[in-house]
Regions:
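Conserved Rossmann-like nucleotide-cofactor binding loop
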Residues: 17, 112-114, 150, 173
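Conserved N-terminal Rossmann-fold NAD(P)-binding element of oxidoreductases
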Residues: 12, 107-109, 145-146
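Glycine-rich FAD pyrophosphate-binding loop
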Residues: 3-22, 161-174
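N-terminal Rossmann-like dinucleotide/flavin-binding domain of flavoprotein oxidoreductases
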Residues: 21-102, 177-201, 209-210
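FAD-site-proximal beta/loop scaffold in flavoenzymes
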Residues: 122-138, 225-275
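Glycine-rich active-site/cofactor-binding loop and its immediate structural neighborhood
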Residues: 84-86, 90-116, 127-129, 134
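Core beta-strand elements of the Rossmann-like FAD/NAD(P) dinucleotide-binding domain
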Residues: 95-104, 219-229, 267
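Rossmann-like dinucleotide-binding cores of NAD(P)H-dependent redox enzymes
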Residues: 54-64, 133-134, 139-143, 149-215, ...
Length: 275
């Protein structure tokens, strides 16, 4: 990248090196899918989740070491916020803040999972894909909200290691953005594996004492018993709300996010947004 070309680069990261792909996306999800594919009856499902974590952490640690060794690159742990057009305040986990000024700033903060508040559902039972890949013990029965790619990947993988899976979504079918033929094939596979699906349904309330999740589907109520985890996989939200874009004068749109030209540059010269 730029550091290899001799440019001085400060890389600011608020969580873990590698972003979504290494930590909560491609790497752990495909690892879990691979391990689940080879899961044998009678094996310990907890070991599958723990091995997924080990492999993810190994790669993350390796990437972190490599990043810190790059010449001309300074790695800074913390959350960045604009205080002016070319100035960032970076606050680390200890609450310490340093100020960084640069002629060029590239915003690449990605997105986070959208979360739902379900009446009665304790925080420790609610998950997104971020929490899922830190889970060391397999749920006995997981309710998955959503019917997109992430929801389906996790439904099939967890079912394969012995977790009972119930999946429901407000959508009319699985994979709403795909062609109907693909959705039909997926639905046939869900049915074959005993994964219960409810479409046009929403979560109404969770009862902790009985671990019962109540859904509404039109005028009907559906009771899903003995649910110990709920995975929310209903889309993502841009990580731009805490960047202080107003202080920098960077224009954004509620629907489009940060506005850029074809070269990724915002309305503020030298400030770029690439994803």
């Amino acid at each position: 990248g730029l550091a290899a070309l001799g440019k001085e680069v400060a890389l600011i990261e608020g969580h873990h090196v590698g972003g979504d792909c290494t930590n909560v996306g491609c790497v752990p999800s495909k690892t879990l899918i691979h391990l689940a594919k080879n899961f044998k009856n009678g094996a310990n499902p907890d070991e599958v989740l723990q091995e997924t974590i080990r492999k993810r952490d190994f790669l993350r640690d390796k990437e972190t070491e490599e990043i810190k060794e790059i010449e001309n690159l300074t790695f800074i742990e913390g959350m960045a916020k604009f205080s002016a057009a070319k100035t960032l305040d970076v606050t680390n986990s200890a609450g310490e803040t340093q100020q960084i000024t640069a002629e060029n700033i590239v915003i690449s903060t990605g997105a986070r999972p959208h979360m739902l508040n379900i009446d009665g559902l304790p925080a420790e039972r609610a998950m997104t894909n971020i929490d899922l890949f830190d889970l060391e013990n397999a749920p006995k029965h997981i309710a998955i909200i959503g019917a997109g790619v992430i929801a389906l990947e996790m439904a099939f993988a967890l079912q394969k290691i012995g977790t009972k899976v119930t999946m429901f979504a407000l959508d009319k079918r699985a994979l709403m953005t795909s062609i109907p033929e693909a959705a039909e094939a997926i639905q046939a596979s869900l049915d074959k594996k005993g994964i219960a699906t409810y479409y046009g349904a929403t979560a109404k309330i969770y009862d902790e004492a009985s671990q019962t999740l109540t859904l509404t589907q039109g005028d009907a109520e559906i009771t899903v018993d003995a649910v110990d985890k709920v995975l929310v996989a209903i889309g993502r939200v841009r990580n731009i709300d805490s960047l202080g874009l107003e202080q920098a004068g960077v224009k954004s749109d509620p629907r489009m996010g940060i506005l850029t030209n074809a070269g990724g540059e915002t309305n503020v010269r030298g400030v770029y947004a690439i994803g």
